[in-house]
Amino acid sequence: MMIEPLYDFSLTAEQEARARTLHESSIILDMLFQGPVGTYSLPEGAEEELLALAQEACPGDEIAQCNWATAEILRRMIGVSYSQLYKDCWYDSGLTGGCRQLSVTDRDEALRSAVELQAEFDTYPWLVKCTSVEQIRRCKKEGLKAGIVTSQEAEGYSKDLKLLELLYNYGLRVQQLSYNNQNLIGADCMEPNGGAGLSKFGIRFVEKCNELGIVVDTGHCGYHTTMDACKYSKAPVIASHTGVEKVNFHARCKSDDEIRAIADTGGVVGIFAMPWFTGADPENTTVDDFIDHIDYVVRLVGIDHVGIGTDWPMPQTKWAAITFKKYVAPTIGFAPGNGPSTEWIHGLKDYRSFINVTRGLVARGYSDEAIRKILGENWLRVFEQVWKK
């Protein structure tokens, strides 16, 4: 439960004070927010307790034990036992808001997921399902937290645009076109040679997102699907959580062409904090490496087109993360050796360390206005342009 020490940026006392003021006063949004509770903020003894309970519930089945433990953490976060932990971790992070994810692997799962997510909103009076920028700004002003409903999966739509309308009416405001596998819309980044572009249905899907006011997200999309999304969308396109190929070459990172195409739509590239995608050595990746990706996007396309989408850490135990990486990740499109595990970015081990992002941006010499844009204002500009009033 201990928060890691502040990362050493060698800031002066004046810079530390400036970073603290910026962190407290800015709207900070994480558009792939897996928190607020992560692996290293679980209560003392939780690892052992959850392992014993998972083994009892799912004897002899490591994958089932992993899934059970992760689901149990989520149950506890909307129950009594972790409710205070959930609130404390979110408020200690300084984040104004972040995504709350729907699972759209099929229609039934989408509806089940919506019920589960609604329970999260209903449990916490300080957590607001936000569908407008005005609501997000009000959350900041009133000391509340903003939940933005998003989905990474799109295979569950099949060719059912009515399901997209249904989920929009529920509150969905950001939709990724593909995860780690090809679907009827387009291709993921793990397909060879950049995968296929948008299908005819995929073009209609993008047009429907534009019509409804749903942000088109290309975070996991392959090269050609990303480029097509930018070509056919009449509204800003984002990559909610990705990295820069020129900083760390990996399939999950975007090329200069993709970053430029997203920026040309008026969109934003969100930088993730996943150690095995961010730096060459996952064991020794730091918040400085994370900020290197931000710096590159700023140099390439300007300060208005970069944001944050950490995607890490996950709300799971260390042993479940190891099991997930070994057995589950390969089944959902991750390359061998990739996927959630026990590594962390030094300086971002926990969401409660999020001030290190602001401190790092101060250390790199960004102005107050630029830092506020990176932390959240760029996302808000896109939402203002896309979301219907």
Feature locations, PLM:
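N-terminal hydrophobic targeting/anchoring segments and the immediately downstream early-domain regions
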Residues: M1-N193, F249-K389
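Divalent metal-binding pocket/active-site signature
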Residues: E155-S158, L166-C253
